[in-house]
Amino acid sequence: MSKNTISLSIYDGSEGMEYIVHKNGDVNITTIHNGGIESEVDVDVECFGFETPEGLIADLIDQGFEIQWPV
């Protein structure tokens, strides 16, 4: 993952979601169902009502998403 992106995820067993938020405002969303990828979509932070990536990131953290730090 590049230094211009941040990954946030939330999982409950084999269900969950991952958001990869890019500095330029692009967002990749992956939905996990029964341990496998169910859907993937690419959108912009403005689709969520935010003008900047930081606003979306703060909202996701408030919802319980966790930042996935590089290993």
Q: Model segments located where?
A:
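Short intrinsically disordered terminal tails
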Residues: 1-4, 66-71
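A short beta-strand micro-motif
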Residues: 4-12
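Acidic, low-complexity, intrinsically disordered interaction modules
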Residues: 11-61, 70-71
